[in-house]
Amino acid sequence: HKDSLNASLALVKGYHSTFPLEEVELEHLYNAIAMRLVIIVTRAAMSKIEEPDNEYLWISEKPAWEVLKKWNKIAPGFAHYSFREACGYKAHPQQEQFNDWASKNKFNISELFPSIDKNNVQHLDLSVASTWIGHQESFNDLDAFQFKIDQLQKKHPQKIIAGGYLEPRVLYTSSAYDKIGNYGAESRTIHLGVDFWLPENTPVHALFDGEVVCAVNDAGNKEYGGLLILKHKTEELEFYTLYGHNTIASVLKHSIGDIIKKGAQITELANYPENGNWAPHLHFQVMLSMLDYKIDYPGVAYHRQMNVWKSICPDPNLLFKSDELAKKNTPTNNDLIDYRKQHLGKSLSLQYKAPIKMVRGAGQYLLDQFGRKYLDTVNNVAHVGHENYNVVKAGQDQMALINTNSRYLHENINELAKELIETLPPELNVLHFVNSGSEANELAIRMVKAVTGEKDIIASEVGYHGNSNMCIDISSYKFDGKSGNGTPEHTHIFPLPDVFRGKYKGENVASKYVEEVQICIEKIQHKGRNVGAFIIEPIISCGGQIELPEGFLSEAYQLVRNAGGICISDEVQVGCGRLGKTFWGFQLHDVVPDIVTIGK
């Protein structure tokens, strides 16, 4: 395992469920594990001397050294708190004590920023699902970000813009926030403090008497810049406060061990790039432990460690007691599922045993509400990546201008038609615009019936062509599936042309699948009717991304046309450049269909 601590937690939790571990035992567990590893490598070294021919005696030496080196890099305190959380205790043993002390004391935000003289807060949502932060491309445009802050401040001149505790964010675009864990890539997204968005050079003052334990220039992209950490003591406990994104000069005037009086000015807010490349703000954080940090401290955590970190770093609003900073209740995934079951039709099904709440797209990834990235190998809507900047911008610009229908003259509909026609063979030069792939295939079948006067359609096994009544009637994927009604009278299905798992396997089987199409034609003609159309995807999508046998499509098209039918290429899921090599799937087969349908 890349993350030995994370791997150990399931073992500790399982052991505790059967043989409960006491809190005092958990204090020593990190060292006990380290000692056991030392014993293993020491005994292996001794065995090599005592019995050099018995390799079994040191079989565990190499993996033990690997784990020991990783274990040595883990902060003992963080391991202790993680073990406590895994066993059902509060991760930090003084969490309740701090909460109790904070509940009996109240501090005003204006004490942090007396020159501003504001206590009320305008909450700013910077979460993964926030529409305020806009497109991912905008995250690092600090001028644009500051402009939006200024506009928000104008709307709320008597309030301080603030927020962010335990907020999952995707603003952290530096690779320093990413790592490879036991289950793949993961990113730190959970914000551990409160951000106060105020102008550069705003003075920051101490909320409590304290002692300087860290005063550094935490240089680097998306770091703190000027960072100050103070230690505070009450009669009952010890805790720390962190002040990030300050001017370097205002921080470095302090030395370790300096005593700070409550109300004293301690720093000034910096602008970018001095503050780590952020719009000006104060990152304010409370900690119950410094762990092993001396010149830095995490301000953002991995989601899987959130319960541990929120115990180590309590909510700063326990001090301020601001309604606006209070964490709002949001529906859980189970709440969303329950509502769907009650009010949404069953056709809107969910994937996975534990459905995922997706709130943002970015290129090849979908992001859940905690900012966790999922490589999207399922959805085919985003031709050029999720939320492609140029596509989003074009849509925003047009929606801000006009959104109407095709009854009026406009250049755009003609320009789109021209661009599509340029990708098609010259024979295909008349377009019909509809709202979806289902409507496109529905219209194609209606045109077939109008032109040929025939109703009989030939389609592939496991083919899918849409969700309207007429499209379901020609979609084996639907009518042969669960709750399907079987093959309709005027639909004729031939076997899925799959050379690996289909009815005919191996090379040179295209002609056998063509013969199956011929059988469908003969059955139609035997009933005294003629073929209306032949419809197929150039790559069968719902059937398993099946490539058609070489030569199959051209021969099948010829048979259908000889019988008076029309050939439809359903490109809804595979067209528009998705295949990479060609813009249209039918171009892979050197054919020209009579009708091409697209959507999505």
PLM feature segments, named:
Residues 1-19, 34-52:
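Active-site activation/catalytic loop segments of kinase-like enzymes and analogous catalytic loops
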Residues 39-93:
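ATP/Mg2+ or Mg2+-diphosphate-binding catalytic cores
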Residues 107-133, 252-274, 280-329:
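Acidic, glycine-rich catalytic/binding loops that coordinate metals and/or anionic ligands
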Residues 206-250:
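Zn2+-dependent peptidoglycan hydrolase active-site motif and core
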Residues 330-362, 380, 513:
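Active-site-adjacent loop/helix segments that line or gate small-molecule/cofactor pockets in enzymes
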Residues 373-454:
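Glycine-rich loop-to-alpha-helix module at the N-terminal edge of alpha/beta enzyme cores
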Residues 418-533:
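PLP-dependent aspartate aminotransferase-fold enzymes
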Residues 500, 537-550, 564-588:
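Conserved PLP phosphate-binding loop immediately N-terminal to the Schiff-base lysine helix
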